[in-house]
Design a protein with these regions (language model features):
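Functionally constrained cores in energy, signaling, and assembly domains
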Residues: 9, 27-28, 50, 54-56, ...
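Short alpha-helical
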Residues: 34-37, 60, 108
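Small-molecule kinase domains that catalyze NTP-dependent phosphoryl transfer to phosphate-bearing small molecules
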Residues: 55, 63-116, 124-132
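Conserved phosphate-donor/acceptor-positioning beta-strand/loop module used by diverse small-molecule
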Residues: 28-30, 45-64, 103
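Hydrophobic "lid"/C-terminal helical patch
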Residues: 17, 117, 121
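Glycine-rich phosphate-binding loop used to anchor ATP phosphates in small-molecule kinases
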Residues: 2-50, 70-73
Length: 132
């Protein structure tokens, strides 16, 4: 995907969530958002917008990659199987500057990460902020 494709998709997801929020519907976007500027743009919609960084080392990502996309992205240029514009390898991924929650998925068990995320969401719901 191009930069524009990624930004357009993230903005569209943000707009949908903003509309749902006006009706007090909680939304969770599970999307790769590699750009700090777009994270900040989405956060400006409401103080209820939160960033969760699902942090994972490259070695673990490669081990978990059932489609082999990371291995293909790491192939030398010119290789017919190489995947180009792959986020975090050959395309930009900016580490979140101030995530509201970090899930260290290469250090935590899936159950630990789920509990942290669930507790975080429930805490956010139980401590509401006025919609601005």
């Amino acid at each position: 995907f191009s930069y524009k494709d990624r930004v357009d998709n993230l903005r569209m997801l943000g707009i949908v969530c903003k509309l749902l929020l006006k009706h007090n519907i909680i939304s969770v976007i599970s999307a790769i958002n590699p750009f700090e500027s777009i994270r900040q743009e989405l956060a400006a919609y409401s103080p209820k917008v939160k960033t969760v960084w699902v942090r994972c080392g490259m070695e673990t990502l490669i081990k978990r990659d059932t489609k082999g996309l990371y291995k293909k992205a790491l192939l030398p240029d010119g290789n017919p199987d190489k995947v180009y514009q792959f986020t975090g390898v050959s395309d930009l991924y900016e580490i979140p500057k101030n995530p509201d929650l970090i899930l260290d998925t290469d250090k935590e068990t899936p159950d630990e990460s789920v509990k942290k995320l669930t507790d975080f969401i429930l805490s956010s719901i139980n401590n509401p902020v006025d919609i601005q």
